[in-house]
């Protein structure tokens, strides 16, 4: 049985994206290795305290950036955090800008996702006898996004609050035709990881908001060099430093009790009659379904 490893105070999770493989300012840091019913998460988690709050940090692509977007075990990552009683997630990622107004090193806080992936199997915890359909009309926690917007702007960063993040598979970047199409469709930024995390966090009743750091203009600006891994390295390093400055101020403002709408996302999502739930599936999902057992 995969019971919760932290039945104390609700914790905060930070998922680090490209260029962000550590988090500064953690008191009493220690590494935690977790096995989940879905396999291993991307890497060991780092546990520590910031502003007297329990925080867990997970590098999405593993330290040393060893995992492609399509190789990520999103279920294991989110399940591992939920098993540690994480109820809020700050998800950090690099994105390409599809609009002139979003410049490299700007921060975009997406309010919507458009999922164009085709290689992300298993973006749900449910099945095997228990059916649930969570609402994703608003996939981002408005409350957490508002905190991040206020604190990041207060630190002097250029913040764009709201926007549509289109999620592609990768690992190759877009063609010019694709990039221009995405622009004309009205999408704001493009990335490779955000949508799956938002879906699974909602099923796990975790409030999630995404900090998307702009590194490039994708390839729609014909007067600029098209995006490449080498051209974005400097922006990645600057963005990682910015993220480390933002975390403490945001974490300090997150409430102590998980009472936002996302924390009760399963109230009207579970379809299968409780009497019909298979015991094996219940054991597997105990961390997520604890309120209903």
Question: Model regions: which residues?
Answer:
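Generic non-transmembrane alpha-helical segments
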Residues: 143, 147-158, 245-253
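Zn-dependent metallopeptidase/amidohydrolase metal-coordination segment
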Residues: 192-230
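Non-catalytic positions within long, well-ordered alpha-helices that form the structural scaffold/packing
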Residues: 82-85, 183, 202
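Metabolite-binding pocket within alpha/beta catalytic cores that recognizes anionic/polar moieties
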Residues: 2-137, 292-293
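Active-site/ligand-binding-proximal alpha/beta "capping" segment
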Residues: 154-188
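His/Asp/Glu-rich mid-to-C-terminal helical/loop segments that flank catalytic regions of hydrolases
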Residues: 219-266
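A short, charged, Gly/Pro-tolerant segment at domain boundaries
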Residues: 259-293
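Short acidic/polar active-site loop segments enriched in Thr and Asp
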Residues: 87-88, 188, 207
């Amino acid at each position: 049985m995969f019971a919760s490893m932290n039945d104390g105070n609700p914790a905060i999770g930070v998922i680090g994206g490209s260029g962000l493989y550590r988090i500064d300012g953690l008191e009493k840091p220690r590494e935690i290795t977790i096995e989940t019913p879905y396999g291993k998460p991307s890497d060991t988690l780092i546990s520590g305290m910031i502003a007297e709050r329990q925080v867990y940090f997970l590098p999405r692509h593993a330290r040393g950036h060893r995992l492609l977007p399509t190789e990520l075990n999103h279920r294991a990552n989110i399940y591992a955090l939920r098993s540690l009683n994480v109820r809020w997630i700050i998800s950090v990622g690099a994105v390409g800008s599809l609009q002139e107004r979003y410049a490299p090193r700007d921060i975009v806080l997406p309010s919507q996702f458009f999922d164009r992936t085709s290689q992300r199997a298993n973006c749900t915890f449910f099945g095997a006898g228990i059916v649930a359909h969570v609402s994703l009309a608003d996939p981002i926690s408005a409350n957490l996004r508002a905190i991040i917007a206020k604190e990041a702007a207060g630190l002097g960063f250029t913040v764009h609050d709201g926007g549509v993040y289109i999620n592609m598979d990768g690992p190759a970047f877009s063609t010019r035709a694709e990039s221009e199409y995405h622009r004309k469709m009205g999408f704001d930024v493009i990335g490779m990881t955000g949508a799956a995390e938002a879906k699974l966090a909602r099923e796990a009743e975790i409030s999630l908001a995404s900090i998307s750091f702009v590194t490039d203009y994708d390839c729609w600006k014909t007067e600029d060099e098209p995006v490449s891994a080498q051209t974005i390295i400097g922006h990645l390093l600057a963005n990682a430093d910015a993220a480390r400055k933002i975390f403490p101020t945001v974490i300090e403002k997150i409430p102590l009790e998980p009472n936002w709408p996302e924390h009760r996302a399963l109230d009207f999502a579970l379809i299968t009659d409780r009497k019909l739930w298979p015991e094996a599936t219940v054991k597997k999902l105990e961390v997520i379904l604890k309120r209903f057992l």
